[in-house]
Amino acid sequence: MSSRRTAPWFLAVVALALAGCATRPINAPLEQVDRKSGYRYETRAERPGNDPSTVVVLAFSGGGMRAAAFSYGVLEELRRTEVSIGGNRTRLIDEVDLITGVSGGSFTALAYGLHGERLFDDYEQRFLKRDVQGELVARSLNPFNWWKFVGGSAGRSELAAEYYDEILFNGATFGDLDRG
């Protein structure tokens, strides 16, 4: 083969080899943990208006967008429901001490943890009423995103994480939960 014919192949092999060297950033380990601060049950349980004698725990299951919509409906109903605790009227949502979620249910749990009452302003439009799966497929098929798949440094999960961050989480980190 002539050098003209081998040059493109050589460049392709070099590009693939270099792409194989790419790695995802790894979270730096914590040097020290302060158990009296940050987002944890012990620091969040005693909030103004929350009765310490009542513990309400929500567990949102998976199931994709249906689970996200169902868990959102649960929060809406808890927001509308008033109860009497210790002679005081309060909304049931104000008594929620802990929310856990997996898969589809985790979107609503996390969004509520980050945004609190603001969740009810635009969660439906920003997330529930979007064609999320269609957008993720479109991004996967977009040639401008294909470079992310080379070398194993990223994949569909990273594309999805970028999209969720763009439409729902806005660059939030675990540390932002403490402010919600």
Give the positions of each predicted feature.
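Conserved Rossmann-like nucleotide-binding pocket used by diverse enzymes
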Residues: 17
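Catalytic domains of lipid- and phosphate-ester/thioester hydrolases
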Residues: 2-8, 12, 20-180
